[in-house]
A protein has these predicted regions:
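ABC ATP-binding cassette signature C-motif
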Residues: 1-193
C-alpha cells in the first residue's frame, strides 16, 4: 500500500443499534489525485471522510494514510472559536512559524546579555531560522494577506461570533489551506459560500 497516499481495505461502519452506514469499502488514492465523493443524503459521505481524516476510528477493516502524510480535514460545520478574531483563527495554521519568530527575537535579545552562552544561542538561532526558512516565515504576513484576499475573508479584526456561516467556513478553509496538508478532505465545501 506504500505507493498510495491513502488506502482503505474492506472498511465498514455500523452505528448502534445495527445501522450499517458503510459496508466493505476498498479505495486507494495516488498522490496528486483529485477525488469527489458523491451520493444521496445519508449515504455515508461524511462518515467516509471522517474515517479518512482519522476522526472516526471505530470501524471494521483497515484505513490508513501513507506514513508521514499530513491530512487536512474541513468538516461541514468547522470548529472556530467564536471569541477569536479572523486573524487569530487564520494564524493558528502558522503557529509553529510565529512561535519560532517570537523565540528568535528572544534569542537575538539574549545575545546582549552579559552572561550569554553564544554557542547555545547560535545553535538555537540556526534551528529557528531553519523553521522560518522552511515555512517562508520571513514572508508570513504577505502569505496571510494573499490567502485572506483570495478567499475574500472578512476584516482581520472581525470577531468570529459576528460572522455568517459562509464567512466562518471561509476562515476555517483559509486556516486549513495555510497549514499545507498533503491530503485535503473537504466535506460539502461549497455549503454556505
Amino acid at each position: 500500500m506504500a505507493q498510495y497516499v491513502y488506502s482503505m481495505h474492506r472498511v465498514g461502519k455500523v452505528v448502534p443499534p445495527k445501522n450499517r452506514i458503510l459496508k466493505d469499502i476498498s479505495l486507494s488514492f495516488f498522490p496528486g489525485a483529485k477525488i469527489g465523493v458523491l451520493g444521496l443524503n445519508g449515504s455515508g459521505k461524511s462518515t467516509l471522510l471522517r474515517i479518512m481524516a482519522g476522526v472516526d476510528t471505530e470501524i471494521e477493516g483497515e484505513a490508513r494514510p501513507m506514513p508521514g502524510i499530513k491530512i487536512g480535514y474541513l468538516p461541514q460545520e468547522p470548529e472556530v472559536d467564536p471569541a477569536k478574531t479572523v486573524r487569530e483563527i487564520v494564524e493558528e495554521a502558522v503557529s509553529e512559524i510565529k512561535d519560532a519568530q517570537a523565540r528568535l527575537d528572544e534569542v537575538y535579545a539574549a545575545y546582549a546579555e552579559p552572561d550569554a552562552d553564544f554557542d547555545a544561542l547560535a545553535a538555537e538561532q540556526a534551528k529557528l531560522e531553519a523553521i522560518l526558512q522552511a515555512g517562508d516565515g520571513h514572508n508570513l504576513d504577505r502569505q496571510l494577506e494573499v490567502a485572506a484576499d483570495a478567499l475574500r475573508l472578512p476584516p482581520w479584526d472581525a470577531r468570529i461570533e459576528h460572522l455568517s456561516g459562509g464567512e466562518k467556513r471561509r476562515v476555517a478553509l483559509c486556516r486549513l489551506l495555510l497549514s499545507a496538508p498533503d491530503m485535503l478532505l473537504l466535506d460539502e465545501p461549497t455549503n454556505h459560500l
